[in-house]
Amino acid sequence: MSPWLRQLVRQEGGLSNKAGSRVAQHSSSADEVCAFVRIHGDAEAVLQRYGSKALAHKGNIYIAAIPVSQLYSLSNNENVSRIEARPYGQALLDSAARAVNLLPAHEGRALPQAFTGKGVVVGVMDIGFDLTHPTFYSRDLSSYRIKALWDMLSRDTLNSSFPVGRDYTTEDELLTLAHSYDGLNQTHGTHTAGIAAGSGYDSPYRGVAPESDICLVANAVSNNVPDIEPEKLHKFTFATDALGFKYMFDYAEQQGKPCVISFSEGSGQDFKGYDVLYYEMLDSLMGPGRIIVSAAGNQSYMKTWFHKPIGEQGRGTFLKYPSSLHQFTLKSAEPFNLRMVVYGESQTDTLLLSTDFVLAQPDSIYTDTLSVNNQLLVVQVEAYPSCYITNEICFDVNYLPIGLSEPYPYLSAEILGIDADVEFWRGNCQLLTNVLNPSLNAGENTHNILSPSSSPRIICVGATCYRDSVLNVSGQWRKTDTYPHGQRISMSSVGPTMDGRIKPDVMAPGGNVISAYSSYYLEHHSDAYDITWDVAHFPFRDRTYAWNSNTGTSMACPVVAGAIALWLQAKPDLTPEEALDVIRHTSKPYDTSLSYPNNEYGYGELDVYAGLLYLLGIDQIKDVSKQHTSAKVSVRGRQLHISLPAVNSPVSLRLYSLSGVQVMSQQIPVGHSDYSISLAALAQGVYAVQISGDAKVQGSTLIRVNE
């Protein structure tokens, strides 16, 4: 069993609980847990024997509802090789840094007219959906584009076949529901879904795939735990999230459409193997026309990792003295010593531990205490092999204060041993410096990609920024950190992963992105801080809605998901590997002095249009520019309409088929700002339009000619 499940069994009385465990404590009254199980042989018979129910499976990996009282017995069955689960993650949003206008690509102005996501399902698993926001209708309000929602938190579960919550699959059901169960207090999903797939209604804040179908899953994260009945918390795990991914892919399969999923949530990686079966299950769900995009995380604003190499006697850091259970992890293939010191007003207390001593203890767990100023710090060290390289041993250092009172002590941790190569991973502690020992200043803002973005096959997205301020609805300028255009925002998580792979894969604008905000959240939290970042309020069908500016990799992720929806429209059987190949060949480097891919920028910043040209083979037509034209080009009926800014020289227009054959050529004289051309002679299909001449409009776009 994975560690969280073992802790759950201890709480139920099946095992003795050990002091200082880093696992979060929950109510022990849950009747079952949703978990991954690897079963060899007759899986249905094994699960039935222990009162468990299979919810889904791929190969020999099952997602099952398991009675907590049967976990220990099931884990000892000879046909069961692993049971894995851990609780919910968190929404990846920085609530203190928001602002500004979207790039033209986000507004839909720089996207080719031929590709809008039509015929593609965009899935979003998130929290806080306003199902009534007009951005989820078509631009002209003639069609409602949310097609299904599985609300995992719903308490309307009579006759529901779902392990938690229920789903809503008709327009009447969805609009009557109006918002997800957590929708009065959360709005994150409204914003991310709007970025990926919003029509923009009557605003410039159009999503990247504004004509796609939308399928939603409202799941559980730390943010919306208050909306969950305490006795049901154990039902919400990564296994439940995996069922959510499957739900969206299954919906798309029923409709005969490709699907890309945007997931702007995550949790820390680990060396215990919490995600082994999770990643295998996600890998099995993906394939041709089935792609998952996930946010890298917002962890790089702080120190998260450091390395003590062989040949260096020691390296260390101060840690913020905890008010609750805190943890960090050390990893090495060689023995070393750990020194922790607590500093009081006039005294110190030191704990010096050798890793060999910890490994010699029962269950490789050792507990001790540090004490100053009548305050006690309980320290527990647990050793186990890395799930990636088994000859490397990991040490989880958990520490918990007892009798906390001011003034708080100071705390330091040092890694000692000249012959040991050791890595430090933050866990949930905070690395600091202190004049008490200025040499203890280790720490880098790296190695902090979250899961499941760290999964090899999932496309991991980091965030860049272009503007630093926005005029809010009250006429006040709201300002965030200033970055050069295209630079990674400081909090956007950085690789490598715990097993050494480069992540993120790609960057997209995630700083100061404007998208939809929930009318129900606005109604119930009108004085909330984030409402001061609303850039507009507007009426729609007797409610007041908002457009809001937000920052985080949560916002960058749906930009990439929306882009892949356009690519799926061009190539419905696009695989995750092919999508990454498009990213590899067409992304834009921020700093050309760097080699790519790298752990800050991946392959660079997404280029939606260049990706389409690459997929369609148009990038091989030498006379077609890879730069999108600034002219407004559209097709209405069988007429091509071009709107030009004031130009100083004649403009030529050429049309090419996807095979590279020039099918039309026209000259537009100086002084003509609007021009129309008949397309009656052309067969239906996609064509490249190349506009040349004046530098203001030099570039290309794609059009679609219908019957």
Description of each model-found segment:
Residues 1-113, 121, 223:
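Autoinhibitory N-terminal propeptides
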Residues 7-27, 70, 91-142, 172-187, ...:
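N-terminal domain-start motif of subtilase-like serine proteases
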Residues 22-26, 227, 254, 258-267, ...:
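C-terminal subdomain of the subtilisin-like protease fold in secreted/lumenal serine endopeptidases
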Residues 109-239, 256-260, 287-291, 303-305, ...:
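Subtilisin-like serine protease catalytic core
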Residues 129-190, 207-209, 255, 345-430, ...:
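Active-site core segment of subtilase-fold serine proteases
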Residues 193, 215-223, 249-259, 289, ...:
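Hydrolase catalytic cores
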Residues 218-219, 245-273, 295-296, 414-420, ...:
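Short acidic, glycine-rich surface-loop motifs adjacent to enzyme active sites
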Residues 665, 684-707:
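C-terminal tail/sorting-segment detector
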